[in-house]
UniProtKB/Swiss-Prot annotation:
It catalyses: L-cysteine + L-glutamate + ATP = gamma-L-glutamyl-L-cysteine + ADP + phosphate + H(+). ATP-dependent carboxylate-amine ligase which exhibits weak glutamate--cysteine ligase activity. GO terms for molecular function: ATP binding; glutamate-cysteine ligase activity. It is an enzyme of class 6 (ligase). It comes from Ralstonia nicotianae (strain ATCC BAA-1114 / GMI1000) (Ralstonia solanacearum). The keyword ATP-binding applies. GO terms for biological process: modified amino acid biosynthetic process. Signal peptide: none annotated. InterPro entries: GCL_type2/YbdK_subfam, GCS2, Gln_synth/guanido_kin_cat_dom, YbdK. This is Putative glutamate--cysteine ligase 2. Belongs to the glutamate--cysteine ligase type 2 family. YbdK subfamily. Keywords: ATP-binding, Ligase, Nucleotide-binding. Its EC number is 6.3.2.2.
Length: 377
């Protein structure tokens, strides 16, 4: 199909999507329970949307269009609470985190959706391995050219987003040494990575049509880029974050992206260039591997420093924009997370270190998501 026109949207409005883990309450392994949970939720009013994902052990929640951090947080809390209530009679737990710590990908079941079945046929075992859990943030753009400007300007800050949300240190029972191992699964797909460097919508449409003519892609859904335009919504979609362990952190990360977008749009502090991507892969790896204690190379100056320092320096620039957006509390939370090196990945590691039991770690993760002190063992 041809690329749809870029829809009109209100600049800097945003929406949040979270992919969540469904686990049984027996041993806290993943459970193929999305259809049952959706049945329990039928007829219950919630803001936003709840829908299945590529495998039956996943479920996705999405807010509606939000103007503020408080609005997004309220919506996510409402959806969370309805889901947690609906899961109780099913003996199912729900938790965040970018990977399930000990699930075996071969045991997963692909959802019945025709698109997911097609992906499974095309990509083989990669589709089941794609049982990983991410946060996506859509940001409204005033024009299609502004969308491409924001996409490439924000690419400098992809390591910020990765490190702030990193929550996937374990894969198949093994500590990977990564803060965000989830993105290694995404990188296996051929249309992943960063978007091509084009700064006008006409040039992007020409690129899309060339790719479509090859038969490699059919729609924007076939691109798994770190940030991609979503013309049907009039947004860009930031896709690099793990799903945090709480809706509070998810909302703070989304508000950080909104404030960053406002600064970039209003101040235009730099013009993106192809050379910005010279250190893109290095910076991305540092954030995935080391999280908030990683290094960061400034694409403009070439200066190498601490990623945490770069986030804190950026947060100072964003302060007036956070104030204008009424998200000062979210920016304060981001600063506190960085200053304390308080990542969700380290919480998972610390909990496993204390309990020596990944099943117990997942159980406590479910409690953290549900905002209760503990859940039945």
């Amino acid at each position: 199909m041809s690329l749809e026109p870029f829809a009109k949207s209100e600049a800097l409005t945003f929406g949040v999507e979270l992919e969540l883990q469904l686990v049984n309450r027996h041993d806290y392994d993943l459970a193929s329970a999305s259809a049952d949970l959706l049945r329990m939720l039928r007829g219950k009013e919630t803001p936003g949307d709840i829908k299945p994902e590529i495998t039956e052990s996943m479920i996705e929640i999405a807010t509606g269009i939000c103007h503020s951090h408080d609005e997004a947080l309220w919506q996510m809390r409402e959806i969370r609470d309805r889901m947690v209530e609906a899961a109780v009679p099913l003996n199912i737990g729900i938790c965040g985190g970018g990977t399930h710590p000990f699930q075996q990908w071969s045991q997963r079941t692909i959802s019945a959706s025709p698109r997911y079945q097609y992906i499974s046929e095309l990509y083989g075992y990669l589709a089941k391995q794609f049982t990983v859990f991410g946060q996506h943030v859509h940001l409204g753009c005033p024009s299609p050219d502004d969308a491409l400007y924001l996409l490439h300007a924000m690419s400098r800050y992809v390591p910020h987003f990765i490190a702030l949300a990193a929550s996937s240190p374990f894969v198949q029972g093994v500590d990977t040494g990564f803060a965000s191992a989830r993105l290694n699964s995404v990188s296996a797909f051929p249309m992943s990575g960063r978007a091509p460097f084009v700064l006008t919508w006409d040039a992007f449409v020409a690129y899309f049509e060339k790719m479509r003519a090859t038969g490699v892609i059919e729609s924007m859904k076939d691109f798994y880029w770190d940030i991609r335009p979503k013309p049907e919504f009039g947004t860009i979609e930031v896709r690099v974050m793990d799903t945090p362990l709480t809706v509070e952190r998810a909302a703070a990360v989304a508000a950080y992206i909104q404030a960053l977008g406002r600064w970039l749009l209003l101040d235009r502090p730099f013009v993106p260039t192809e050379d910005d991507y010279l250190v893109y892969t290095f910076n991305r790896f540092q954030a995935c591997r080391f999280g908030l204690v990683g290094e960061y190379v400034d694409p403009a100056s070439g200066q190498r420093g601490a990623l945490a320092d770069h986030i804190l320096e950026t947060s100072k620039l964003l302060a007036p924009h956070a104030e204008a957006l009424a998200s000062e509390g979210a920016l304060d939370m981001v600063r506190e997370v960085v200053e304390r090196r308080d990542s969700d990945a380290e919480w998972i590691r610390a909990t496993e270190g204390e309990t020596r039991n990944l099943h117990e770690t997942v159980r406590r993760g479910c409690g953290r998501w549900a905002q209760v002190a503990s859940l039945p063992a």
